[in-house]
């Protein structure tokens, strides 16, 4: 069901999904505005194939985002919403110590290119929180600590110089009804003179008293979204044995969430 609080009045404006992947963001946008995105762009044929299967009404471009001309794509129609979720692995703390790719770290500049070319009324970018540390790489191919965040500030400044009001917030989807506690950065830019409005949390930590006091719904768990009746091979039946580190993590999880938990996590099969 659509919440009137979140419906964007896009009228006849186009909705564009850059870095569309298999369509996760497009599905969320469709739930929010009540229709499919108009254009989806991604370089991966398999991802675009999956997106086409789930969003047949959408116009698809299987290409590098920098090779797609915004003016040619939009055919003179106004763009109401441009959504971008560029590759995050070269910013994420989960990446480890491997050198970063300068090309991948520069993907977000495509947003500025679209802003210059067709001036979308609203721009949204989603990424890991470390995206705010975007800066130049040193000679060793790793981010330069002394210039942390420099490129990110330049990127935001470029949008503001084009007439956009820009705001950034770190949000967790679990506070809005999705079963994940991961924190993500959301950047919203508008050039229509209207204020940027952020949603108020609808869900909260069930262990905290303020969740009930504020009338919030308890966080959902991933277990609620899994059909446990589906036959699935056991992780312990793999041909390749599990690594010792993996086994230790499993053991720690059993201790924490089953043996020592106030409410042990158990699934009836």
Question: Where are the predicted features?
Answer:
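Class I S-adenosyl-L-methionine
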Residues: 68-81, 88-238, 266
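Generic enzyme active-site microenvironment
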Residues: 15, 40, 83, 124-125
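Conserved short alpha-helix immediately C-terminal to the canonical SAM/SAH-binding motif I
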Residues: 46-50, 107
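Conserved beta-strand segments of alpha/beta enzyme cores
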Residues: 36-39, 59, 165-167
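S-adenosyl-L-methionine
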Residues: 1-43, 47, 49-76
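Short, well-ordered alpha-helices that flank and scaffold nucleotide-derived cofactor binding pockets
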Residues: 27-31, 53, 113-116, 157, ...
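Residues lining hydrophobic/aromatic ligand-binding pockets adjacent to catalytic sites
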Residues: 248
